[in-house]
Amino acid sequence: MKKLIGFAGSAVALAGLALGAEAIVNAKPACDRACLTGFADTFFKALVDNRVSAVPLASTVKVTLNGQAMKLDQAFWDGADRTVYRWDIVNEQLGDVASEAVVLNADGSKTMYMVRLKVVGGKITEVETIKANKGEADRLWDPDNLTAVSPALQLSIREADQDSYYGLIAAAESYWRAFQTNGTDAYHPASLMPDARRFENGVQTTGLVRNGVYASAPEGFDKGRFKGRNLWDRRYPVVDTERGVVLSIVRFGLKDGMKSESAATTNDRLVAEFFAVKSGRIQEIHAVLFNLPDAKPTGWEPQFGPGRGGS
């Protein structure tokens, strides 16, 4: 009888643990999608108002602009007039929100802008921004091309059809792996749809007909057009399973002893790249790029990938 009672007690305890685990998984996040995008709304309004005090910052907040640590008032700029293009992704479980935006300035110029916020306990603990103006990423510049937000970036995918958290990261990592190995015997193709569209600071580089020839994202890797590039300091700070979009932040450098295959890819860069993924394959890519020498830090710890120079 004691054994039966003991077994029953264990079963009840296990059932309790299972219910507890289920409750944790199904628990409402402290800050849901609307809440997190609300923090982004507040940030962008404070930017155009140039009023840092309106942003609910934690006392220990970490702020970077193009890899340089600074206070938020140093990361804002006086000329920001209004946001003319913006879309967001979130991770409710981890309190992350990231935005790609185009900011119209008072002088009529435009700024490409990526903002990543971490929210904990109702306060922003991390602010990471990448900001590029015309000429700061060579010829990659066409923010006027970004008007209506692509439907591929705004989906609400039903749970049964969603790629997993790590599945989204795997798709993005396949892209960097293809970039890293293209033109070599170790080349491994990326998980790209044949008609994948890529936008770099607004310039559409693939998924369109150019000079009578279709520009294919997979073909660029297949033909080794980016041989020698080193994709390092890789991070995946925001993963949105409902939207099917993952943000990766990386460094574009060169492998030791290699030269760029193209004048357009000569400079080292800090890049925020958003990947829209469907059933494990990349459908659309949006990147904010800023020229940053490999020797300069980003202020954040890498998660994966080779080191500087490809080591």
Language-model region placement:
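C-terminal and inter-domain tail/linker signature
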Residues: E22-S311
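Gram-negative bacterial Sec-dependent N-terminal signal peptides
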Residues: K2-A21
